[in-house]
């Protein structure tokens, strides 16, 4: 069984993380480990109709963001890596500066030190120079910066289409193949 850590921070776009968990429920060989910041809980209630209970039920394992002794806080716990979707600037800053004040940033720090993939879906705009420098520093220490920027070549017809394309592309970063792609991939002109 492959394990993927899914982090949801307080940035706008909680629906991306929720959809990722929903999609991974149908992937038999991937076990999801969810950690949500306190701010993520608030964003979830402000932006979606999903309850915290529903989101937790979508994950195979849920970790309390305050539990720094959780399995995902150790490098000996084998995982494919971690995605933080969405990733707030606060979370990005904590990761870059190794400020592991909770499980979300601790798990990310562990993934980096173990040289496993860490995908940060930074959800902020516009960006000032400090934000850009943080993203550069994160990339320099091994993270993949992957803002949830929609593509339009697949001609999305709904918000779900836009979300699905991003979720599918995030899973590509971990070489997780879905039974069926969530969007039409570019085949050339």
What are the language-model segments listed below?
Residues 1-119, 123-189:
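A cross-family phosphate/adenosyl-ligand binding-site feature
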